[in-house]
A protein has these predicted regions:
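Gly/Gly-Pro- and Ser/Thr-rich, intrinsically disordered tail segments characteristic of DNA damage-repair
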Residues: 1-220, 226-230
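DNA-contacting surface of Y-family translesion DNA polymerases
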Residues: 46-47, 173, 183-349
Length: 350
C-alpha cells in the first residue's frame, strides 16, 4: 500500500506537469482510476488502483493438485519435483524423443492444456540444469514479451547464461543468492555473476574462507553449473525431519487473537505429525509484528527493515525443548501457547 501511494504521488505530479490533472476544490486530482497497465501507461491522469483478494489457501491447493494432474499426463512423477504451490521442476530429457518435440514445444503443450483446463497462464524456464531452468523462468522469461495468452518461455544454457546474465543486476534476483550473501560478496567488490566467476579464478581461497563449503555452490552458479539433478533430489533422505507451519495474516491481529492463531497452527502441526507417524521433542516459534506499530509513533523498541522496505518492530523468536518426544495435540498446543506468551509483546499487533 505504501508503494502504491508513492507511485500515485509521482503520477499526480506528472499529470500536473503535463496539464492532464483535473482540479477539485482547487486541488489537482486524478480523472479516474485503473489497474490496467496499458491504460495507466497511456494516461498519466489515471490513479493506480488495485484489488485486494483475501487468501484462499484451500482453493489454491485444490487448483495446484489439478494442475499437477495435468503434468502427470505427460511426465512421470519420478521426474517432477514440486518446489512450491505454483512451481515445479521437470526433467524432460527422456521425453523429448518420445514426443518428438523440442523442450520449448513440450513446455508450451503442457502450458496450453493448463490454460484451457483452468484458465491459468504460466511462465516456463528451460535450462540445461536445474539452476539455469530456474533463472530462465525467474529472470529471462519475466523480461520477455508474453504471447496473446500471457505465456512466457525462455531458455538458457551455460553459454547464453554467461552472455546474458553475467552483467545482470541485482544479484539478489539470482536463485539462492540472498541479501546476506550479496553483502558479503560486495565486501570483495563483487556485484555481478561475471565478477564472481572471474574472482573464483584468481581468489578462490578467499571465497572459501568467507563462505566455507557454500563457496563451491556459489562458484558453480557463477559459471552456470549445477551438479544436483532431480534424480538425486528424489533419492535424498534427510537424517532428521522437521515440519513447519507458516501463516500471513490478512490484517493486524491483537495479542489475544494472535494467540488463538498460534494454537490453531500448532493443531495443524499435530495433524501433520500424526499423518507422518512422527513425534517431536522441540518447538520453535517466530512472530512478526505489523508495521502499524511503528506508524502510530508510539513504539520505541528495536526495529528492522522487512522484505518490502518497511520499518517494523523486531520480531520475536523462541524455542522450547520437551521432556519427552510426543505428537499429543493437547500437550503441543499448550506448549505453543506458553511459548507465545513468553516471547510475544502483548502491546503489539501481529
Amino acid at each position: 500500500m505504501q508503494k502504491v501511494k508513492e507511485v500515485n504521488a509521482n503520477r499526480l505530479r506528472e499529470a500536473v506537469r503535463l496539464r492532464k490533472a483535473v482540479y477539485k476544490d482547487g486541488k489537482p486530482s486524478f480523472s479516474s482510476a485503473s489497474y490496467d497497465s496499458l491504460s495507466l501507461a497511456a494516461d498519466p491522469s489515471l490513479e493506480l488502483s488495485y484489488l485486494v483478494a483475501p487468501p484462499r489457501m484451500a482453493y489454491y491447493e485444490k487448483v495446484s493438485r489439478q494442475i499437477y494432474g495435468i503434468y502427470l499426463k505427460y511426465i512421470a512423477p519420478e521426474d517432477i519435483v514440486v518446489y512450491s504451490i505454483d512451481e515445479v521442476f521437470i526433467d524432460a530429457t527422456s521425453y523429448l524423443s518420445h514426443y518428438n518435440m523440442t523442450a520449448h514445444d513440450l513446455a508450451m503443450t503442457i502450458i496450453r492444456e493448463v490454460l484451457y483446463t483452468t484458465g491459468i497462464t504460466a511462465t516456463a524456464g528451460i535450462g540445461t540444469n536445474l539452476y539455469l531452468a530456474k533463472l530462465a523462468m525467474d529472470i529471462t522469461a519475466k523480461h520477455a514479451a508474453p504471447d496473446k495468452d500471457g505465456v512466457r518461455i525462455a531458455e538458457l544454457d551455460e553459454e547464453s547464461f554467461r552472455y546474458l546474465l553475467w552483467d545482470y543486476k541485482p544479484l539478489t534476483d539470482f536463485w539462492m543468492t540472498g541479501p546476506g550473501t550479496v553483502k558479503r560478496l560486495e565486501k570483495h567488490g563483487i556485484h555481478t555473476m561475471g565478477e564472481l566467476a572471474y574472482f573464483s579464478t584468481v581468489n578462490q581461497d578467499i571465497l572459501y574462507r568467507e563462505f566455507g563449503v557454500d563457496a563451491e555452490l556459489l562458484i558453480d552458479h557463477a559459471w552456470g553449473l549445477e551438479p544436483c539433478s532431480i534424480k538425486e533430489i528424489k533419492a535424498y533422505k534427510p537424517s532428521t525431519n522437521s515440519i513447519s507451519e507458516g501463516l500471513v495474516l490478512s490484517c493486524p491481529y491483537p495479542y489475544d487473537k494472535a494467540r488463538i492463531i498460534i494454537m490453531e497452527m500448532a493443531d495443524s502441526l499435530v495433524l501433520q505429525l500424526t499423518d507422518k507417524g512422527l513425534v517431536t521433542d522441540s518447538l520453535t516459534l517466530d512472530v512478526g509484528y505489523d508495521r502499524e506499530n511503528c506508524d502510530s509513533g508510539k513504539y520505541r523498541g528495536p526495529v528492522h527493515i522487512d522484505h518490502y522496505g518497511r520499518t517494523v518492530p523486531k520480531g520475536a523468536h523462541g524455542s522450547t525443548k520437551l521432556d519427552n518426544p510426543t505428537n499429543l495435540g493437547s500437550q503441543l498446543i499448550k506448549v505453543a501457547a506458553t511459548l507465545f506468551d513468553q516471547i510475544a509483546d502483548k502491546t503489539l499487533t501481529v
